[in-house]
C-alpha cells in the first residue's frame, strides 16, 4: 500500500498516486485485451521537481529511471536526505564512456548500451569490482542519426560480442522509436524490435530466463504493450495534473 497519503508530498501532489494507479490499471487492461503479459512499469523521473519525485517514490517505490548520471546522483541524494529507500535504478539515457565508472554495480540496469566501446568499458569496470552489470542493447529502430542505439542490422553482432564478456549480463533490448503524432504509428518500430528480440532469444543470446523488451514511453506505451513490451518507461503521464 502506498504511504503517500501520510506524507507532505502526498498532500501537495495527490494526483501522482492516482496517476500511478490509473496507469497500472491501463497496462493490465491493454495487455489482457492484446493477449500478452502485463509489462513492468519503470517511472522516468527526469521531468519531476524534487517534491514530485519524492511523492512518486512514496507511491511507487519499486523502480525508477533517469536519463543522465548527474541527475541520478542528485535523486539518490534526495532520497537519502528524505530517509526513503532507494528504488531499483535504471539508466536509460545515452551513457558516455567516461561516466561508466559512476554507475556500474550501482544501478540495476543500463538500458542504453549501444556500442562495443561502451560495453567493453562496462565490462572492464564490472570485472574490476567483482560484479556483473545487467544491460540492454538499445536499438535505433527509427534509424535516426541524432539518436543513440545500434542499427537493427548491426544488433546481432553487438549482442554476440556482449555474450563473450564476463562482466556484463545481456538481459534484453530497448528502443525508443521516432517521435510521432499518432501513437499507432509507433507499432512498426516496436514490431521490428520485437522481431529482433524473439530471434535473439531463440538463439540464446540473452543470459536470463526472463529477457526484457523495453519499449514505450508516455506517448507510446499503449502500442508498445500491444507489440509485446515486457517493460515500459513512462514519465510525463505520471506527473500530469488535470483539474
Q: Which ranges hold each PLM region?
A:
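Conserved alpha/beta-domain cores
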Residues: 2-219, 227, 239
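Gly/Pro- and small hydrophobic-enriched strand-loop and loop-to-helix capping segments
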Residues: 229-243
Amino acid at each position: 500500500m502506498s504511504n503517500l497519503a501520510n506524507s507532505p508530498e502526498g498532500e501537495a501532489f495527490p494526483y501522482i498516486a492516482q496517476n500511478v494507479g490509473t496507469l497500472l490499471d491501463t497496462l493490465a487492461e491493454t495487455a489482457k485485451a492484446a493477449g500478452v503479459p502485463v509489462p513492468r512499469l519503470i517511472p522516468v523521473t527526469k521531468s519531476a521537481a524534487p517534491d514530485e519525485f519524492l511523492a512518486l517514490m512514496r507511491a511507487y517505490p519499486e523502480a525508477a529511471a533517469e536519463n543522465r548520471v548527474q541527475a541520478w546522483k542528485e535523486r539518490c541524494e534526495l532520497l537519502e536526505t528524505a530517509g526513503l529507500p532507494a528504488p531499483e535504478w535504471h539508466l536509460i539515457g545515452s551513457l558516455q564512456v567516461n561516466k561508466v565508472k559512476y554507475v556500474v554495480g550501482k544501478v540495476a540496469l543500463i538500458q542504453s548500451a549501444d556500442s562495443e566501446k561502451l560495453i567493453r568499458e562496462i565490462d572492464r569496470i564490472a570485472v574490476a569490482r567483482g560484479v556483473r552489470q545487467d544491460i540492454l542493447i538499445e536499438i535505433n529502430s527509427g534509424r535516426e542519426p541524432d539518436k543513440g542505439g545500434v542499427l537493427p542490422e548491426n544488433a546481432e553482432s553487438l549482442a554476440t560480442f556482449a555474450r563473450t564478456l564476463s562482466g556484463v549480463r545481456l538481459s534484453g533490448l530497448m528502443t525508443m522509436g521516432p517521435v510521432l503524432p499518432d501513437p499507432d504509428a509507433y507499432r512498426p518500430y516496436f514490431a521490428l524490435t520485437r522481431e529482433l528480440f524473439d530471434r535473439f532469444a531463440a538463439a540464446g543470446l540473452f543470459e536470463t530466463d526472463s529477457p526484457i523488451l523495453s519499449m514505450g514511453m508516455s506517448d507510446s506505451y499503449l502500442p508498445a504493450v500491444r507489440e509485446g513490451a515486457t517493460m515500459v518507461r513512462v514519465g510525463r503521464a505520471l506527473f500530469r495534473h488535470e483539474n
